């Protein structure tokens, strides 16, 4: 299979990044990619979707990862995964010898290791300039679920019509479920036995980078998790707070030492 053929399959089956901004997958398939990375850092608290999916479908995802590397001509295919995800690592090690091109890079348990710029530096030593794209450094990064969707499109000829979503926090039975695209957040939460608090707030995504949603909002191709929280939870209150309040607090506390900027992984 050549790059154009794989790109066509991705377009026809609606495969996009299953997290973040939902970047079209076919646009990452280029012969400029010297290294491809699988992002299984998953550093948002409470979220386990990627490691669960990779553990359950290790062979299928690794096979697809190797196929993508061969198609674009990448010399390395690196799985970036935190060293604490022991069960998932064990599942990968059962098949790693079948794919000589694929390597596992163990990551430290720090935040924000899942940020692709941080991941690229930790796994390859390459630095993406501020505002730049990974491909400028010869790297393409793929989400675990995205690669599983590539597998389903190539091997099973199935388009992306469903999404894996973790439902956690104030629910009866925290669970990861497979649901059709377009169903509401309330319908997904019902699969976890319903909420355990009155007037719940549906927080879409992880507690660090997520947003407040509405129960009638639809599941999209980038919906990874739903956190059900009480309305007075500190995370909810922080998201509802205006930025001007945070700026005033920062101005009253900051001594302009510049250390936070020096240490910021995005700087």
Report the location of each language-model feature:
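Iron-sulfur-cluster electron-transfer modules
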Residues: 1-123, 251, 267
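Flexible, glycine/charged-enriched surface loops at secondary-structure junctions
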Residues: 72-79, 197-205, 264
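Hydrophobic alpha-helical positions that pack around
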Residues: 78, 83-183, 191-196, 206
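Short acidic beta-strand-loop surface patches of small beta-rich interaction domains
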Residues: 82-86, 200-219
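Extended, low-polarity segments enriched in aliphatic/aromatic residues
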Residues: 176-178, 210-225, 233
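Short alpha-helical segments in extracytoplasmic peptidoglycan/chitin-binding modules
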Residues: 182, 187-189, 202, 264
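Ferredoxin-like iron-sulfur electron-transfer modules
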Residues: 234-258
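Iron-sulfur cluster-binding cysteine motifs and their immediate structural context
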Residues: 259-267
């Amino acid at each position: 299979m050549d790059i154009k053929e794989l790109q066509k399959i991705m377009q026809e089956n609606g495969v996009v990044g299953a997290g973040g901004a939902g970047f079209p997958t076919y646009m990452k398939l280029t012969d400029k990619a010297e290294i491809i990375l699988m992002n299984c850092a998953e550093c948002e608290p409470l979220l386990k979707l990627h490691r669960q999916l990779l553990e359950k479908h290790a062979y299928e995802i690794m096979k697809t990862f190797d196929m993508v590397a061969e198609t674009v001509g990448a010399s390395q295919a690196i799985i970036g995964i935190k060293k604490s995800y022991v069960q998932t690592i064990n599942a990968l090690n059962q098949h790693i010898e079948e794919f000589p091109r694929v390597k596992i890079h163990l990551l430290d348990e720090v935040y924000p290791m899942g940020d692709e710029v941080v991941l690229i530096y930790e796994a390859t030593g390459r630095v993406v300039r501020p505002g730049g794209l990974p491909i400028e450094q010869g790297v393409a990064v793929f989400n675990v679920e995205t690669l599983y969707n590539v597998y389903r499109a190539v091997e099973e000829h199935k388009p992306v019509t469903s999404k894996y979503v973790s439902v956690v926090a104030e629910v009866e039975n925290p669970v990861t479920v497979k649901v059709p695209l377009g169903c509401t957040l309330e319908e997904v939460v019902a699969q976890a036995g319903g909420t355990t608090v009155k007037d719940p707030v549906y927080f879409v995504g992880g507690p660090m980078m997520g947003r407040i949603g509405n129960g009638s909002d639809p599941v999209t191709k980038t919906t990874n998790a739903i956190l059900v929280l009480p309305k007075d939870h500190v995370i909810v209150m922080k998201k509802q707070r205006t930025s001007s309040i945070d700026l005033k607090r920062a101005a009253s506390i900051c001594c302009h030492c510049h250390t936070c900027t020096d240490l910021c992984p995005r700087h």
